[in-house]
Structures are given as structure tokens and as C-alpha cells.
Amino acid sequence: IPDAVLYPDNREQIEKVVAYCSTHKIPIYVYGGGSSVTRGVECVKGGISLDMRLRFNKVIAFNEKDQTITVQAGMSGPQLEKTLNDAEKLFGAKRAYTCGHFPQSFEYSSVGGWVITRGAGQNSTYYGKIEDMVLEQKYATPIGNIVTSPYPREATGPSLNHIMMGSEGAFGVLTDVTLRVFRLTKENRKCFSFMFHNWEEAQEATREMMQCEAGFASVFRCSDAE
């Protein structure tokens, strides 16, 4: 049980909380959507629960030319997807967009949670995992802010972007994230299903479809009789 629950409005408040708690040795537990299956959001030693969902969930910038969106880490998955689907109305965009990331916890998880757990989803075969979508991250840490570079590709390494992703709060509190987004083309969606005589044939067909250089399905499932 936390000693206090804080609901930040902006990045500056988070920075002050992190600095204060670091100085006074107070543990911080960042709460996004609460969908963790590893019990990582439980305040096992008291301290501060930093709840990002209620107020820290805004769009910071939308860039249609580069097809990117920058949001606060507390934004929920459904909120992000609806925002992108309504881009024409909200941002005066030329078309609708999608985030392309739909983990099993989509309805309850936050964008920040996707990044710090290095998540995957049912559409990752086509769009990639979350690390393939992240361009830039901003973190509040006890020693100051960490901002990764916003470039889609770099020749230098190690990649700070990839080091920070999957860290689950070990290096700081993720505040802002810039993601690639994708054009929403519902007219191109087709659904198919096939039945095979046995599991071995199904596996072979699946392997061939993934390796034949004919493009990837957005959602691809191979299931046995059970």
C-alpha cells in the first residue's frame, strides 16, 4: 500500500517528485494502466504511487508529414488509437491513422507501459514490436532528464533508445514518447482462414508464408485442434 498517490499534470511535476524522492530515499512506483502480470505496480515498501492515467495523458504533437505522434506516457491504448483514427477531425490531417500496436492488454494498458515493458501485440508481424515504433523517449531520473535522439536510424551504438526500452522504471520515469504511426486503410483488409490435414502441414505452410517474400500478414495465427 502506498503512503501517497500522486496524479501529475505535467513533466515538471514528475521531475520534482523524482528529485524529492531520490533525496529523501522514498520509493516510487509508476502506475500506468495497471495491467502488469509481474506485480510490478505493487507498493511493497510503501512510498509514492505515481498514477499517470488520470491527468498525464495528452497529445503533445502530431506530425503528419513524418507520420509520428508524441504523447504523454499515461495515455491509454484505446485513447491513442481513437485519437489517430480521428486525426482528420482533430488535427486537420489528410487521412486517418492507426498506432498498429495491439497487445492483449490493449484495453487497459498505457503507451508508457508498452515502451517500458518492450511489448508486442497481435499485429506485430506486420507493424513490428513497440521498439520498432519508438523514435524518441524522455525520462525523469534522479540525476536529471534523459532524452534519446529522435532519428529513425543511426550509425552509432549502443542505442540509448533500445537500452531504455524494457527497463521497467529501473532508469527513471518515462514521461514523453514519440511513435511512428501508420495510415489506416480498412479497404485493404482481407481475412482468410485455412484448414490443414495435420499440424505438420500447418507449420510448413506457415513457415512458407513467412519466408516467401510476399509480404507479411498483419495478424497471423496457427492453431492446433485445442
Predicted segments, located by residue:
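A structural preference for short, hydrophobic beta-strand core positions in alpha/beta folds
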Residues: 30, 219-222
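Short proline/glycine- and acidic-rich turn/helix-capping motifs at secondary-structure junctions
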Residues: 37, 222-226
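FAD-binding subdomain of flavoenzyme oxidoreductases
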Residues: 58-220
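Glycine-rich N-terminal segment of FAD-binding domains in flavoprotein oxidoreductases
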Residues: 1-55
